[in-house]
């Protein structure tokens, strides 16, 4: 049995769909265990199509596909084509495939945070409208009152994988830090959807899951993975902090405005917030940083929008959705004309939800480190294989990447070969890499000889 979230389910390209599920890392592990004499069957709550999403639930669209889209100039005329991810329309309504006695070996629930695994009613259709249930678990839960852990325990697994805790920091990060760091608050029922879970809550839940699975089968063995840093994935690394091209004249005009604000800041004993821009293609984007003191009341009216603005630094993470916003005139949705005064990321600060600032990223890293310390301790205390997913994702994020049978894999968006089009989840080959990381840990801990999966045999990004 495999317990976890989207990374366990095979979610990729922004959706859960059939082909992705068939290339989930647990299904790959099951096949390799089958080669070694283990069970030949591994059941998954398969989606009814290869698009994903739910037509009757807002916010659950279909998968992203790579398509050639129009490139327009400032007048709206099409001047070329470019490759870009485009989200599909959801293909079907929510289908119920669970029920009494209907168990699935893959218990990965996209969107689940640690404490959701032990929440009764997380698979209740009635609770969906209350925000207390998850449609993916509603699909395959054995009852409206069960929990993910209860359904996993009922299967009395002889071997299990557990990978949970990613979403406890990820939703905060992908929202650009719009949530709250709940460190010190042990009551998840009071959390917002984008909050960082208190590390003690995560540790307690994971301990209870392990003890629950052990109580279901005293002879069970297992592998538990730690949490990768968000700085390892393309959603946070694909867009540079300094992608703004400026002419000499534009740089000079902007410098005049920003230097005046810097002078005002300096006069009241505050640090400067704006860089000196140059005639180049690598100027920093203008962002909102809500940790800054708001000085809008002390600025001339035309500068009031810069009250909590500054230029980004190399330590800020610009989120992937910003790539379609930076350099665009917000009044037209098109590239700026020679007379445009409003340009996203240049004269108009990027919205807070499009940037994970250095301070916000530090909160994510600190929470991740705390989660991982607990995961490591719990693995040791319970004799489980510890899968260092964090180290593997760091390795993937290096320039040299990871080599496999003549193919180089990196964390670069689209071109790196390991991540799907949502920039967060791996593609088939990325999940195969994860499967091999699990296999290495399992073999090391239990003395088994499970063979690696062939990474190159699985699917990558599909080009049109």
Labelled PLM ranges:
Residues 1-464:
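Conserved active-site regions of diverse hydrolases
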